[in-house]
Regions:
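Enriched for short, Lys/Arg-rich terminal
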Residues: 2-5, 14, 18, 24-25, ...
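A short, surface-exposed loop/turn module that caps and links secondary-structure elements
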Residues: 32-60
């Protein structure tokens, strides 16, 4: 794939904007890095018991936040769709 796009369907962008500022920056920076490496070694297939093709869970333990996203090919591009962002409790 020569090009990648990031989508924020549903409420995912609002979930990011609702985070405290330092975590918001961390999540935004992490999403930016997904453009260079859509499936980093820290990303786990999701759900763990029966993974869906292209679905990942990226847990950032030092920041206490998890990002769920999908990576799918579309017309010669990879589309990274941020599905859900949540603070770990």
């Amino acid at each position: 794939m020569s090009d990648r796009l990031v989508r924020f369907p549903g409420m995912s962008w609002q979930e990011i904007e609702a985070l405290p500022q330092p975590l918001r920056w961390t999540v935004q920076r992490t999403i930016f890095h997904l453009l260079g490496e859509p499936v980093p070694t820290l990303a786990d297939p999701f759900p763990s018991d029966d993974p869906l093709p292209g679905a990942y869970e990226l847990h950032l333990p030092s920041d206490g936040v998890t990002i769920w996203y999908t990576v799918t090919p579309h017309e010669g591009q990879e589309v990274i769709s941020i599905q859900h962002v949540r603070l770990d409790t």
